[in-house]
């Protein structure tokens, strides 16, 4: 996998499963290393030997766990015994979750469009349980034009967010809004959050601005929220509730 040449991923974990097509038996490979790495899954071809797989990492040790199966299910069980189990998902998360950037990007009345979509799923007998709300809901005017600013609402698209959420709940739908974990430098709440000491400090590798690290976010440069701090997590939760 190469992020520069293929579709980007939100994260990658150096774990994979190899299945023998003949025996139908599997084995898991987990490389316990957080450094940047790449895998060659048998794509290499040389004239003197058969195709082979390889692993390369920029730093750290080759700390490899071979996880016995023979079934894929048993490998996953043992892999999660090693790394930790995920929290049990809510039942609704196992159902159909609607999602579309189209509705939140409409010039106006996105709220009505989403409600109409949910009503249509009911009419067509599609048992929808949730809706992933794309970030168009928080696209608002700033000093540098329209930007997606977490914890704001575009009131042309969502006229009364509280009422809209109530209507979705009434229809049995759990809404999962896209909440970006960074604050643009033009964000209207930036100074308030700075005063609450919610951002990562600058470093030797990132001079930043005003002593705070800066990265590239959707819409331009912004600050990194420091979720390692208990106080930041509490402030963040309160912003979600208030919004």
Locate each region found by the language model.
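Catalytic and substrate-binding clefts that recognize carbohydrates or anionic sugar/phosphate headgroups
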Residues: 1-93, 99-102, 110-112, 118-123
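Aromatic-lined carbohydrate-binding/catalytic grooves of carbohydrate-active enzymes
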Residues: 87-243
